[in-house]
Amino acid sequence: MTMKMMVHIYFVSLLLLLFHSYAIDIENEITEFFNKMRDTLPAKDSKWLNPACMFGGTMNDIAALGEPFSAKCPPIEDSLLSHRYKDYVVKWERLEKNRRRQVSNKRVKHGDLWIANYTSKFSNRRYLCTVTTKNGDCVQGIVRSHIKKPPSCIPKTYELGTHDKYGIDLYCGILYAKHYNNITWYKDNKEINIDDIKYSQTGKKLIIHNPELEDSGRYNCYVHYDDVRIKNDIVVSRCKILTVIPSQDHRFKLILDPKINVTIGEPANITCTAVSTSLLIDDVLIEWENPSGWLIGFDFDVYSVLTSRGGITEATLYFENVTEEYIGNTYKCRGHNYYFEKTLTTTVVLE
C-alpha cells in the first residue's frame, strides 16, 4: 500500500468519525429538546406518560364538524423524530380525569386516530399515543383537536398569460382527514372528465390545461372516504369560484410627496400611492424602508399601514411623536408587482 493511499484512507476514516460524532450530538440535542418539552407539560398530561418511553411532543389538529378527522401520532409526523421509527405499532388511548381507556379499533385507521363523524364532544378530548418499535423502543405523544369552520367557497382569480404552460391549479382543501379513497371534481354541477388533456388530477389538485376565459365557474370537489367498517359511506365537499380574466396592463404610477412637513412633539404621516389599471386586486405591493434600508412594519414610534381598493394601493407611514432625530431622515417607498418595480423617496423637514 502506497503512502498516498494510506493518507487518503486516514482522512476518509477521520471524516467518517467526525460525521458520526456530529450525528450523535444532533440526536442527543433532539432528545434533550423533547425532554424539556415533557417537563413543561401540565400535570394532567404528564402523569399518564411512561417514564421508560421517550416523549415525542404534542399536536393540536384542526377538525371540521360533521366531517372525518384523522391525526398521526406526533413523533411519527415530526421531522426531527420520524426517521427514528420505521417498523412500529401504534397504540391509542383516550385520557380522562382519573383513567385512560384504549381507543376502539373503529377509531384507528392505518395507525392513525380516525373519527368518521367529528362532533363538538371530541374537541375536549385528549389522546395518548404510544409508538413501539420492533426492538422494544417506545415514544409517546399527546393529541388534541380544535374546530375550524371550513369556508363556504374560496374565490380564485387567474390572469391569462401568467402561467398558461403550467395550467391553473385548484386545490381541494380537505385538510382535516387523511386516507381518502378518491376525489371527483365538478364544474357548474357537471362532473369533469379527467382526460389528461384539458383536465388532469394530482392528489388533491385539479389542473386545468390551456386556460381560457370559459374556464371561469364554480368548481366543487367531492372527497370520498372509506370508513373502517363501511365502504364509501362518507363524502365531504369543498368549493372554488374561479374567475379567469384577460391579460392585464401591470404598469402603475407611484405618487409621493418629496417632503414630510413635521412639527417637533407632534404626530405626522405621509401616504405613498400606487395607481394601477389592472383588474387584479392587490396587484401592487408597497413597502416603506427606513434610512438604514430596513423594511418598516407595524412597529412602535414609526410604522406603516397598507390599504387597497379598486386598483389603488396606499401605504401610509406614521410617526407617533416626531423628535429631532427624525429631522433630515429620508424614507424610501417601494412599489412593485411581478412585472415592475418603482421607488420614490421623501425627507422629513420642519415646517
UniProtKB/Swiss-Prot annotation:
Keywords: Disulfide bond, Early protein, Glycoprotein, Host-virus interaction, Immunoglobulin domain, Inhibition of host innate immune response by virus, Inhibition of host interferon signaling pathway by virus, Interferon antiviral system evasion, Repeat, Secreted, Signal, Viral immunoevasion. It comes from the Viruses. The keyword Oxidoreductase does not apply. Its main location: secreted. GO terms for biological process: symbiont-mediated suppression of host innate immune response; symbiont-mediated suppression of host type I interferon-mediated signaling pathway. InterPro entries: Ig-like_dom, Ig-like_dom_sf, Ig-like_fold, Ig_sub, IL-1_rcpt_fam, Immunoglobulin_dom. Glycans are attached at residues 117, 182, 261, 269, 321. This is Soluble interferon alpha/beta receptor OPG204. Residues 246-345 form the Ig-like V-type domain. Disulfide bonds join 73-129, 172-221, 272-333. The gene is OPG204. The keyword Phosphoprotein does not apply. Gene3D superfamilies: Immunoglobulins. The lineage of its organism: Viruses, Varidnaviria, Bamfordvirae, Nucleocytoviricota, Pokkesviricetes. Counteracts the antiviral effects of host IFN-alpha/beta and key IFN-inducible proteins involved in viral RNA degradation suxh as host OAS1. Acts as a soluble IFN-alpha receptor and thus inhibits the interaction between host IFN-alpha and its receptor. It comes from Vaccinia virus (strain Dairen I) (VACV). It is found in: Secreted. Belongs to the interleukin-1 receptor family. One of its GO terms (cellular component) is extracellular region. Residues 65-137, 155-237 form the Ig-like C2-type domain. Interacts with host IFNA1.
